[in-house]
Amino acid sequence: MITGKTLITGVIGHPIEHSFSPPMHNNAYKLMNMDYKYVPFHVEVENLKHVITSAKTLNIKGLNVTIPHKTTIIPYLDEIDETAEKIGAVNTINFKDGIAKGYNTDGIGAIVSIEKYTSLKDKNIMIIGAGGASKAITFTLLNKNINQLIVANRSKDNAQKLITNLKNQTNFENIDFINIKKTDNVIDDVDIIINTTPIGMYPKDEVAPPIKTDKISSKHTVMDIIYNPLETQLLKQSKKQGATTIPGTHMLINQGIKAFEIFTGKTPSYESFEKPLLKHLQG
């Protein structure tokens, strides 16, 4: 039941109809007996400038930010977390004492997911793709004492921009580029593989994985940030080769849990987010 005491959080995006965040957050609120509701808000690009002022006026406590607003929302914020500023994208906004502060929980969501299965310390990691998700994850990775980062991408220019940016912001130098078609040459030297491209996403989930998988083995941990389908072709083939695989639902859940903590100061259980997500994905 919604009353005058109910606190509102939500997510802004365009489109927003297919967001999985509302069922996850609302289920956690219910299980934790918290008088909160999480609402999806459809915000078109031309109306973005009004969001922060409107949220403050309506006493909204927090907002997640999804496509296409993660970068364009930044000029309207009062403050931005150091990590989000370096990544150049915001996916979470907290409102407190009239201040709208932006955060990015995508990177930490990925890191928590990987560390559930393996340590990152001294590992050689290959990340596939050089877009926004790759930037969020790689920046966070470089603070985890890894040994080497390899960026596999079709476009060398885009990868090089990412690499230069990472080196400038972290002073981590052991970062290399490889063409996505030549990853076979380095698979044996890599411990962890992360796909951040949309290759394999529904409805094109039967296409070949972004890299060849015949050299993947039991020594590898492979994560795909795609969560629909639950198991991409990359994960299916890697599992057949003996690798430990991590589906994209893990990152989606863990970044959401971090946002929940920012909004409320409380930590929901992993299961409270996982159950409604799987229900919607499988339903």
Swiss-Prot record:
InterPro entries linked: Aminoacid_DH-like_N_sf (IPR046346), NAD(P)-bd_dom_sf (IPR036291), SDH_C (IPR041121), Shikimate_DH (IPR011342), Shikimate_DH-bd_N (IPR013708), Shikimate_DH_fam (IPR022893), Shikm_DH/Glu-tRNA_Rdtase (IPR006151)
Q: Under which main EC class is this enzyme filed?
A: oxidoreductase
Question: Which residues are listed for shikimate binding in this entry?
Answer: S19, F20, S21, T66, N91, D106, Y227
Any Pfam family hit: SDH_C
This enzyme catalyses: shikimate + NADP(+) = 3-dehydroshikimate + NADPH + H(+)
Q: Which GO terms describe its molecular function?
A: NADP binding; shikimate 3-dehydrogenase (NADP+) activity
Q: Which residues form the active site?
A: K70
Q: In which pathway does it act?
A: Metabolic intermediate biosynthesis; chorismate biosynthesis; chorismate from D-erythrose 4-phosphate and phosphoenolpyruvate: step 4/7
Q: Supply the alphabetized keyword list.
A: Amino-acid biosynthesis, Aromatic amino acid biosynthesis, NADP, Oxidoreductase
What EC number(s) has UniProt assigned to this enzyme? 1.1.1.25
Name the Gene Ontology biological process terms.
amino acid biosynthetic process; aromatic amino acid family biosynthetic process; chorismate biosynthetic process; shikimate metabolic process
Binding sites annotated in the UniProt record for NADP(+)? E82, G129, A130, G131, G132, A133, I225, G248
What's this chain's function? Involved in the biosynthesis of the chorismate, which leads to the biosynthesis of aromatic amino acids. Catalyzes the reversible NADPH linked reduction of 3-dehydroshikimate (DHSA) to yield shikimate (SA).
- Subunit info? Homodimer.
Family under the similarity heading: Belongs to the shikimate dehydrogenase family.
Protein name (Swiss-Prot/TrEMBL): Shikimate dehydrogenase (NADP(+))
Q: Which organism is it from?
A: Methanosphaera stadtmanae (strain ATCC 43021 / DSM 3091 / JCM 11832 / MCB-3)
